[in-house]
Amino acid sequence: MSVFPIKNDVINAVIAGIENAKRNYTFWTSDELYLSYAPPKFLTIHVAQEIGKLANAPEIFIDATISDILRCSLPNRTDFRDFMKKNYIMDRLLCLTLDERFTHKSDNDSVSRVIMSLKNGVRNVQEEYKNDIEVMCKMLERDKKEDSTLDYAIFAFYLDISSSARKNAQERLDNIIESFDSIVASHKNLKSSFKGGSIKKIEKVGEWCIGCYVIEHTL
């Protein structure tokens, strides 16, 4: 097995990817549009590119299904259906999955380590975001470390608001983190942290920031 990149390097790459997405979109649209107007995959592609530059870069998969991720992370590859049924998980896509990079002997020996949800134009706590956090918690939660190869999950986002908004960016950020914290706290053997959130102000226009909410097991 190859050496997997350390968590902080991955998080920094995610933030750098979103920063690069913002620079590119602003330049490409000649300062006419903000990043929040970009299509959903815009963040994903830029983040994947930055992670791909890391030393010991992992295998990177865009829009992998939850069933495939579980198949590549549970001890028994055939247990994913029972796991999903037991935890009330509907199959759908996750933005990015990072797998161990090695020479494969078959098309069924991948090992998933990190899962990510990337959201653009985040301004308030939405059910969609809370559902992503809940699902990722269920995928990470376990009684023993060896019950899954998944190490952590990242919910990364770009937030921007106009200067006329009722709530400022810091209030919105605090509400988002508080909401996510309550979900993580309802699951055993999990902890969370937040990186980013440095709010940038644009005079007479508004505020923006980039955040990475990280969930990991404590075993």
Locate the predicted segments by residue:
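Hydrophobic, Leu/Ile/Phe/Ala-enriched alpha-helical segments that form helix-helix packing faces
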Residues: 17-25, 47-55, 136-144, 173-188
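Charged, often low-complexity linker/regulatory segments
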Residues: 1-52
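Alpha-helix termini
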Residues: 55, 101-108, 140-148
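Short acidic, S/G/P-rich loop/turn micro-motifs used as interaction or catalytic elements
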Residues: 121-126, 161-165
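Conserved catalytic cores of phosphodiester-cleaving nucleases, focusing on short active-site segments
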Residues: 96-100, 111-122, 136
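Domain-level recognition of nuclease-like catalytic cores that cleave nucleotide substrates
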Residues: 141, 147-219
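Active-site-adjacent loop/helix micro-motif of nuclease/hydrolase catalytic cores
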Residues: 107, 123-135
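Active-site metal-binding core of divalent-cation-utilizing nuclease and nuclease-like domains
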Residues: 35, 59-108, 200-204
